[in-house]
């Protein structure tokens, strides 16, 4: 009904105003005081997205707002194609996770064949430190053709940037210019925070 749709429109408007007037300015302000964190926490430099948000309602991967692909070694000038239906391309590993696979922790599984069997063997809280030689996370570790890859907000923003998505490039370039930083600063702890902000 029209009243419910009007309420939804108002909620979306308030959320948009909050992001534009609070979230983005706060992220830029805080980041300007902690710019050294743009040089910390860099991962492996490999990023993967599965693709999402069909722009025309079809299942055609080429029509997705967020393309599927892999960026290797921080090279934003080249995006590798990814085939989610190829079990040799994409696998999830749990060797350092609090899960177990029926075939053991050493073997990766394709997400379509994945298992989520809880196997917490970590310390009993409270604890001071985790043993990183064993399980220490509830996350699975994705691999593309055997290479570890990062997924999530930073991967999505970088994939859009590398694919030439105009709005993403404009937003990222604007934020980096305000902070007087190169695109390479995104490969960091604060870069991940900035990616969450830009994605919102």
Regions found by a protein language model. Give the residues of each.
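Active-site bordering "gate/hinge" segments
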Residues: 1-199
């Amino acid at each position: 009904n029209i009243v419910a749709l009007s309420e939804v429109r108002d909620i979306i408007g308030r959320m948009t105003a909050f992001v534009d007037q609070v979230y983005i300015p706060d992220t830029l302000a805080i980041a300007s005081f902690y710019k050294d964190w743009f040089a910390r926490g860099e991962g492996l430099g490999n990023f993967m997205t599965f693709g999402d948000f069909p722009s025309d309602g079809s299942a055609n991967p080429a029509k997705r707002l967020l393309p599927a692909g892999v960026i290797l070694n921080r090279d934003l000038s080249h995006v590798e194609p990814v085939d989610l239906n190829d079990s040799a391309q994409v696998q999830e590993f749990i060797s350092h996770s609090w899960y177990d696979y029926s075939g053991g922790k050493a073997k990766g599984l394709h997400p379509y064949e994945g298992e989520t069997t809880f196997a917490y063997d970590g310390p009993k809280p409270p604890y001071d430190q985790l043993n990183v030689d064993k399980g220490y996370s509830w996350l699975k570790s994705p691999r593309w053709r055997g290479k570890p890859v990062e997924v999530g907000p930073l991967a999505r923003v970088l994939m859009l940037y590398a694919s030439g998505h105009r709005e993403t490039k404009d937003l990222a370039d604007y934020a980096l210019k305000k902070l007087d930083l190169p695109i390479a600063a995104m490969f960091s702890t604060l870069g991940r925070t900035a990616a969450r902000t830009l994605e919102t």
